[in-house]
């Protein structure tokens, strides 16, 4: 069971990169989810934004794993993951109407244990259960412009407030806005409500309601909002419903998926892989 979703998601979030051969690299963010494979056995799934993989022209990307050492230090140990076959065909699965991608991977045992259970992906009723709406705080993890929190390669944790209304149901509102500054490299990172954010919810009589639980993953960051080439410091979050559906498509390509409203958010621009981050 997840005890502190912020800490657990920090452990499960990784930098994705691919060198471009000219001294630059394209960078994005991904996170690990634990789900059940077609054989009924547990598997580790890497989730990111579809455009992160699409903007990587090579067959192999690198996942920024982190290895803990006996003395309490950490080592950054990026490992290859194949994202295309020899003919250039995509090996990942993507949602038919939303910017979400998933690929089953064989992670080091330490990282496989860090994967977040799929049950922590939000459903429509989750927002109601936690009383989350416009103005409430959510957290986001990522690697803005390829920058990590330290030499060990941990992601940078930031926060913002829900900036749109309403945010459910996901079929009608497949994305929502988050009031925080987004940079290339952030795309694909998880957006979530932590245990602390949901622990104290006002009751109707003015008292505090019991803790709603350790939190949930609301979705993943996919775009930023720009107007006339000016960044508005607003992120676009794709709802977790579409992560669930993409993972289901890994097992069964005929699994049902929601054809969501595809009307673009004015000024939306992908938040990774459109600019290469220098090493």
Kindly label every feature range from the protein language model.
Residues 10-14, 18-20, 27, 56-175, ...:
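Serine endopeptidase catalytic core focused on the charge-relay Asp
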Residues 6-9, 193-279:
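C-terminal subregion of chymotrypsin/trypsin-like serine protease catalytic domains
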Residues 48:
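Cytochrome P450 catalytic-core helices
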Residues 1, 6, 22:
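Short, surface-exposed loop/strand segments
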Residues 19-45, 234:
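A conserved glycine-rich beta-strand in the N-terminal activation segment of trypsin-fold
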Residues 33-35, 165, 194, 223:
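Residue-level recognition of beta-strand microenvironments
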């Amino acid at each position: 069971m997840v005890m502190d979703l912020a800490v657990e998601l920090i452990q499960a979030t990784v930098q994705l990169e691919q060198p471009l051969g000219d001294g630059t690299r394209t960078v994005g963010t991904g996170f690990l989810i634990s789900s059940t494979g077609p054989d009924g056995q547990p598997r580790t799934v890497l989730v990111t934004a579809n455009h992160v993989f699409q903007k990587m022209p090579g067959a192999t990307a690198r996942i920024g794993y982190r290895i803990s050492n006996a003395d309490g230090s950490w080592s950054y140990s990026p490992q290859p993951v194949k994202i295309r076959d020899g003919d250039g065909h995509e090996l990942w699965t993507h949602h038919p109407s939303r910017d979400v991608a998933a690929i089953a991977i064989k992670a080091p045992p330490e990282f496989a244990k860090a994967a977040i259970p799929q049950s922590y992906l939000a459903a429509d009723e989750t927002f109601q259960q936690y009383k989350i709406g416009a103005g409430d705080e959510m957290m986001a993890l990522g690697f803005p412009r390829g920058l990590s929190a330290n030499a060990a390669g941990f992601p940078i944790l930031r926060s913002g407030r829900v900036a749109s209304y309403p945010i459910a149901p996901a079929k009608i509102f497949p994305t929502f806005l988050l009031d925080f500054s987004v940079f290339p490299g952030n795309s694909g990172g998880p957006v979530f409500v932590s245990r602390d954010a949901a622990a104290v919810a006002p009751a109707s009589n003015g008292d505090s309601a019991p803790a709603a639980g350790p939190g949930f993953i609301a979705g993943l960051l996919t775009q930023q909002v720009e107007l006339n080439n000016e960044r508005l410091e607003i992120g676009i979050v794709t709802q977790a419903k579409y992560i669930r559906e993409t993972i289901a498509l890994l097992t069964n390509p005929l699994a049902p998926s929601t054809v969501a409203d595809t009307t673009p958010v004015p000024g939306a621009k992908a938040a990774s892989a459109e600019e290469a981050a220098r090493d």
